[in-house]
Amino acid sequence: MSRLQTRFAQLKEQNRAALVTFVTAGDPNYDTSLAILKGLPAAGADVIELGMPFTDPMADGPAIQLANIRALGAKQNLAKTLQMVREFREGNSDTPLVLMGYFNPIHHYGVPRFIADAKAAGVDGLIVVDMPPEHNSELCDPAQAAGIDFIRLTTPTTDDARLPKVLDGSSGFVYYVSVAGVTGAGAATLEHVEEAVARLRRHTDLPISIGFGIRTPEQAAAIARLADGVVVGSALIDHIASAESSEQAVDGVLSLCAALSEGVRKARVS
């Protein structure tokens, strides 16, 4: 089994959801970002999404757009992001790590080279928001052939006619964007999320992770009762943006991660 399959299976046995954390690689700089990345598992992150910085992150809200700007300003690129994964893997062989971003940097790096280097570095999955299933042959198929999961986003506007197509070729888990729009937007209602999860379960056996708008341990716990994974990104990145030092950035992110993890872990305890 892949690291993602193993982790979600373990958590199912424990009757709890995964805490999935998102940070942008190289934000605010390489060393601070690597320290955050290395600290996330001990702070309670079950799965890590690592953003690949890009100049035009159109699906992301202001917090992650600014994170991209900070990372690019610190000279982060795809090669350095893969190096960061390699350094993370030197001390962690079991936490699933997923790269998330846009196709443009991968295209410029070269798809075959990227897949080979990502696999060698220890990448477990990809979320590429601007690669619809109609283009599976360009990245999804070769990535999966190399043993890298390809995770799809679904949204409130993905109707029943479109959903099977979106899920075609998906692996690892399904990422449900609970608010239509950009990342970090307002939280969805629990009733809406519950209905969406039920609809997705009719179409797939993959674990379902919910993201966009989750900022507090209480919100994370509420989602953890309904879904297999709880994704938090913008709330963590806000701590990097407001930090006055590298130490403050690391401490702020890891402290919030620990609080979110506690919320997720207690969510299903009666």
Swiss-Prot record:
GO cellular component: cytosol
Catalytic activity: (1S,2R)-1-C-(indol-3-yl)glycerol 3-phosphate + L-serine = D-glyceraldehyde 3-phosphate + L-tryptophan + H2O
Keyword Lyase tagged: yes
UniProt-recorded name of the protein: Tryptophan synthase alpha chain
UniProt record similarity statement: Belongs to the TrpA family.
Assembly and oligomerization: Tetramer of two alpha and two beta chains.
Pfam families associated with the record: Trp_syntA
The species this protein was found in: Pseudomonas fluorescens (strain ATCC BAA-477 / NRRL B-23932 / Pf-5)
